[in-house]
A protein has these predicted regions:
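Domain-level recognition of soluble alpha/beta enzyme cores
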Residues: 161-185
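General small-molecule cofactor/ligand-binding pocket signal
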Residues: 4, 73-75, 183
């Protein structure tokens, strides 16, 4: 069985992401339709789409669900990092109000104000991912799709490849609207 990880389509990067609720840009929507076409052409069959409930991922999941004819299950625990007060803030305003505050500048156990730390994020994603994998293995042998975020995919790939997760270094690439297959057994 395969679970295909996919990062949401292009969103507006002039805002801080995290738990923001900005949707996809028009180019991001085009990326989603192109991915749906690619899935159909390559004869990939999924019986379920799991998705973060944050707007940019949920919007992608809804389009894919309509194109592929399969249900969506929203998984809030597979959201991007909770960046607290920075969520959805314009980058220039965030830089002005909170100079030098970035994901990569946090200590591993340091939380965003009203948010979570890299350690909390990784532990949340690891637990949610392992739970989803175990549930799939018990219920079905069919493939599935997980629509989520770059940071979530990074954490999952660290789990799957036994790589030490860090907010200081990115180990894997997760381009917008590209499938990343994970074989589950």
């Amino acid at each position: 069985m395969t679970i295909y990880l996919v990062r949401h389509g292009k969103d507006d990067d002039t805002f801080r992401g995290g738990w923001s609720n900005h949707g996809l840009l028009p180019i991001g929507i085009k990326q989603v339709y192109a991915l749906a076409k690619e899935i159909a052409i390559t004869n990939i069959h999924v019986d379920c789409i799991y998705s973060s409930d944050i707007q940019r991922a949920a919007e992608m999941a809804e389009i894919l669900s309509n194109c592929l004819g399969c249900p969506i299950e929203y998984v809030p625990k597979l959201r991007e990092v909770d960046n607290g007060i920075l969520a959805g803030m314009e980058n220039n305003l965030a830089d002005e109000r909170y100079p030098g505050l970035y994901w990569s500048t946090l200590d591993y156990d340091e939380c965003y104000t009203n948010g979570e730390s890299p350690e909390m994020f990784y532990n949340r994603i690891k637990a949610a991912w392992l739970g989803l994998k175990n549930r799939r293995l018990k219920q079905t042998t069919k493939d599935a799709l997980l629509v989520t975020h770059g940071g979530v995919i990074e954490a999952i790939l660290c789990v799957e490849n036994n790589v030490l997760f860090s907010n200081k270094t990115r180990h894997f690439s997760a381009p917008n609207a590209k499938l990343i297959p994970i074989e589950i057994s």
